[in-house]
Amino acid sequence: MRPRTHGAPPRNIMSTIPKWFKGAPFGVQSHRFDVSAVYPNQKKFSTFTEAPYSRHHSVELSHIGPGTYNSKDTCFSKKFLEQKLGSGWSQAHEATRLTQLPHFHYQAIKKEKEQQVHKRGPGSYNIKDFITELQKKPQSKRGLLSSGETRFRGFIGNYYPGPGNYGEKGNPYTQLEEKAWNRSHSDGLMCRVSNKPPLFHQGSGLGPGTYTIKSDLETFVKKSTGNRGPYDIFSGERSSPLPYGHYSVQKMKPKELTDYKSFLDEMNSQHKKKQGVFSKYPRDPKHPTERIFWTTLSQCPKNMDIAGPGSWLPHETEQKHVNRPPFLLASKRCGLKAYQMILGTWNPVGVGRYLNTTLMESIDRRQRYRSLYMSEPKRYLQDLTRDRLMQKRITPITKGKCRPTVDYNSDPTP
């Protein structure tokens, strides 16, 4: 017989463990836990596992079922009551602590409030920036580089087709020739005249003796009139209550059911008319709705119809009519210098040709001293002798003289 190798599972361990029950309580006599779970090759399907080689887990905890409980160790047993009586103060302390605790739904809120009270200072606040706030708002599905536009479109804007691309089969004059030909040959002279309107029907078409004309008297007699007579004040019976006047009796309105609005009337009302209606705005707009996203070219593309670099609109300039000089020279053909050299006269006679054009009335004839024009202005401290002399001229007369002071508040001297 081959000896068993080390680590092989025991083959008769299931038969050696005693049973704690009689019969089959759950319809099966096999054990609830399979010890061979440690060895995958020996594991049975749909069986529970347990900690192997442990009598505490395998016997006391795993074999639980009807008839296996000890009725003596209940909550009313002496052993259980002695344990509870011994720790009465600790239970009272624990109960007091539990009453001070908030409900488990509000524990997170209370903890957050306590942190706000104790943690106050720089760096302890969670202030959200504008980027985080913008991320919470409904935004566009596009990314930073996706414009939502077709990558390759047809030529637009500054594209002009070349020769041979206009008109039918590349000839732009084909349509004009066809119109000229049809206008002069296809329509006749009478075809251009507009249709005349149909004549009106004269008469009703009824023969003599087929209709009757009612007279004015018959029409007046058949006219609907009231049933009251000349002496009838109120219509109806005399015994009925008076509906009008001072002695009238108020009519009671018939009892009617309350007029509730139907579901259709309520949905068509002014406040609920737009509910459930598709919006007219596009889901993916061409330009984003928020101005902060207008900075990037991918989210706010430029209009392709606008002329780009290399194209411009010429400015319309006003053409002014200017009389050009005969030989493109602005100078006079015969100036004053040339006239003096040719004729030899230095004082030509004529209108505007006088050299001395000063008016006699504007000449200043006042006589002045010659020394005024020969003197030069001198600065202060340039000539000390002259400065000392000039200082004496402006010296006041009362310099060095002290006038007697008179006190007008005191009594006059006798």
UniProtKB/Swiss-Prot annotation:
Residue runs in coiled coils: none
Disulfide cross-links: none
Organism domain of life: Eukaryota
Protein name: Ciliary microtubule-associated protein 2
Gene from which the chain derives: Cimap2
